[in-house]
A protein has these predicted regions:
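N-terminal signal peptide c-region/cleavage motif recognized by signal peptidases
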Residues: 13-17
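Bacterial N-terminal signal peptides that target proteins for export
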Residues: 1-8
Length: 200
């Protein structure tokens, strides 16, 4: 019997909050980002999630910083690992609307492991907000990683808001847009549960 599956998620919160939990993100750049843009997006996304107690380990699987063979890109995926695609095209909407979405994640209430971010959509939004493209790209990646940990829902404020506004863009410029405290606790507990299960 696997006891970790019978433990309620909230029982892991106390122990999980004592130390940072690790999330491995396999980055697949199909959009041809420069090394500088890639470095900025990984730094920004890492900082956005670090505030919640999540340490991101990047596996550069495809793109300017990829150095083959990347072991994390080749081995079987673990529960604490996600795939993040950076695409050169727009992303199709699941409900048929014409809104250009920054990203998309295949997620259920239990989370997910596959996400994509659209470079054209991010460029357009960054221009509208008057902020750096690679800064917004980092936040878009962090947002989609959040869906992988939290599920498909959105919040009324912060990193997981459905549609960011200029106030959010100002917070991004200060590197101060984060998960809410409740979201952070849930995300860290999910990672702790995944890592505990992987050891058994």
């Amino acid at each position: 019997m696997n006891l970790t599956k019978t433990l309620p998620l909230f029982l892991l919160v106390a122990s999980a909050s004592c130390s940072a939990q690790t999330l491995v993100i396999g980055l697949y750049d199909y959009a041809g980002l420069s090394a500088k843009e890639t470095a900025r997006l990984t730094e920004t996304a890492g900082l956005a999630l670090a505030d919640a107690g999540i340490q991101v380990v990047w596996a550069d699987c495809r793109g300017a910083l990829a150095v083959p063979p990347a072991a994390a890109c080749e081995r079987e995926m673990q529960a604490s690992q996600i795939v993040m695609r950076i695409t050169p095209t727009g992303l199709p909407s699941s409900n048929g609307d014409r809104v250009q979405h920054l990203g998309k994640t295949l997620a259920t209430a239990d989370g997910g492991q596959f996400a994509s971010v659209s470079v054209p959509a991010v460029r357009a939004q960054a221009a509208e907000f008057g902020i750096a493209f690679d800064l917004l790209l980092g936040y878009a990646v962090a947002h989609e990683a959040g869906h992988c940990l939290l599920g498909p829902g959105h919040s009324y404020s912060g990193l997981m808001r459905a549609a960011w506004n200029r106030k959010d863009a100002e917070e991004m410029s200060r590197l101060s847009l984060h998960l809410t405290k409740q979201e952070a606790r849930k995300a860290v507990a999910r990672l702790a549960l995944a890592q505990t299960a992987a050891k058994m």
